[in-house]
Amino acid sequence: MLDHNEYPTVSGDYPLTDEWAVTLPSTFQTKIEDEDLVIWKSGLTIWCSVWDIDYGETQQDAMAWVVEEQAEKAFDVHQTEKDGLIFYRYRLFEETNDYSVASVYCFVFSHSSYIQLGIYVDDEADYAQAIEICESMTFINMAVLH
């Protein structure tokens, strides 16, 4: 469905790729920018990037690289496992939003790929919704095996 701005609108369970899906708590708009999927609504923007995990590499190997490369000023670091997936996230104050509200970086690792969600909120009150979106990620192509 296209809105007045000619961007598709999505809500609820939404497949991001052939392998990954997210549950969106309300209506968002979508577009492709710089080869990434961008999902947004007023006050909240999500940038989605997906990478393959190399043959012979494990979820833990891929996550170790992300942890090693994360910004030094990352805080509120959280890791959990659910349904065979590893969820890893942290927050970071950035120039993007004038250092006023910390962004949320969420990574979810399957056996064959991982997805990064960079979630930018304009108001701290939207932080809970950003976490809800991170935790809703699902891997929908369990047939992909190394």
Task: Show the residue positions of the predicted features.
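Short, hydrophobic/aromatic-rich segments at coil-to-beta transitions
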Residues: 7-12, 35, 82-91
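Surface-exposed amphipathic alpha-helical segments
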Residues: 26-28, 117-146
